[in-house]
Every structure is written in C-alpha cells, then in structure tokens.
Curated annotation (Swiss-Prot):
Keywords: Ribonucleoprotein, Ribosomal protein. Coiled coil: none annotated. Pfam families: Ribosomal_L19. InterPro entries: Ribosomal_bL19, Ribosomal_bL19_CS, Ribosomal_bL19_sf, Translation_prot_SH3-like_sf. Signal peptide: none annotated. This is Large ribosomal subunit protein bL19. It comes from the Bacteria. GO terms for biological process: translation. This protein is located at the 30S-50S ribosomal subunit interface and may play a role in the structure and function of the aminoacyl-tRNA binding site. One of its GO terms (molecular function) is structural constituent of ribosome. SUPFAM superfamilies: Translation proteins SH3-like domain. The lineage of its organism: Bacteria, Pseudomonadati, Pseudomonadota, Betaproteobacteria, Burkholderiales. Belongs to the bacterial ribosomal protein bL19 family.
Length: 128
C-alpha cells in the first residue's frame, strides 16, 4: 500500500462514517445537511442509485428521482460532511453497474425489480 492510499485509509477511519452497503439499482434515502442563512436543517433526498464510483476517499454516487414529472439527478460524495446519513430503503435487481439508460425511460419501463433476500435451507425446509 503506497503513501497516498495509507493517508486516505487513515482519513476514512478518522471520519468514522457508517456507510451502508448499497449498489446501482437500490433505492436510498440520503439525508443532507442544508444551511440556509443561519439555519441548519436536514433534507431527505430519496431516489434510485444509477451509478456508484469507488475511489477511496473520492467515492461518490448518483441518485435519480422523479420530482413533479421531471427527472432530477444529484451526485453525492460518499464521505462528504454534508451527508448526515444514508439509508437503503429497497434493494434493486439489475444487471448493469451504471443505469444511465434510465434517463431515456419514463413510467413503467423505468421501474426496477426488487431483489428478494436469498432463501436459506432452513427456510426452504420449513416451507415444504
């Protein structure tokens, strides 16, 4: 591990952020710290992750949502101090790492199938 990777790993450990395991296709709720004048509040941004970029401290992800009939995308830096928390609401079952094709789709064709948790042998035996 070189010096830059070591420094980035130390900085990530110092930030002590709990980032859930999510990927493209998942529906997430990102709570963002918003400063308006002297007031500070938390704003929730809910949408589908269409891209995730894993670059250590420079990691980021793009969340897309439909707001009053118009598609809105927002890029978040994973370790940004503006992000209060990230919550995974729903797992999506997709076959691509980048879901940029959703930009051209609307309505039912833009839906993503839900990924159901894998059945264990004990659960399968009790169901039979």
């Amino acid at each position: 591990m070189n010096l830059i990777q070591t420094l980035e790993a130390e900085e990530i450990a110092r930030l002590n952020k709990t980032i859930p395991d999510f990927s493209a296709g998942d529906t997430v709720i990102v709570n963002v710290n918003v400063v308006e004048g002297s007031r500070k509040r938390v704003q929730a941004y809910e949408g589908v992750v269409i891209a995730k970029r894993n670059r250590g401290l420079n990691s980021g992800f793009i969340v897309r949502k439909i707001s009053s009939g118009e598609g809105v995308e927002r890029t978040f830096q994973t370790y940004s101090p503006l992000i209060a928390s990230i919550e995974v609401k729903r797992r999506g079952d997709v076959r691509r790492a980048k879901l940029y094709y959703l930009r051209e789709r609307s309505g039912k064709s833009a839906r993503i199938k839900e990924k159901l948790p894998a059945r264990t042998k004990a659960a399968a035996a009790s169901a039979a």
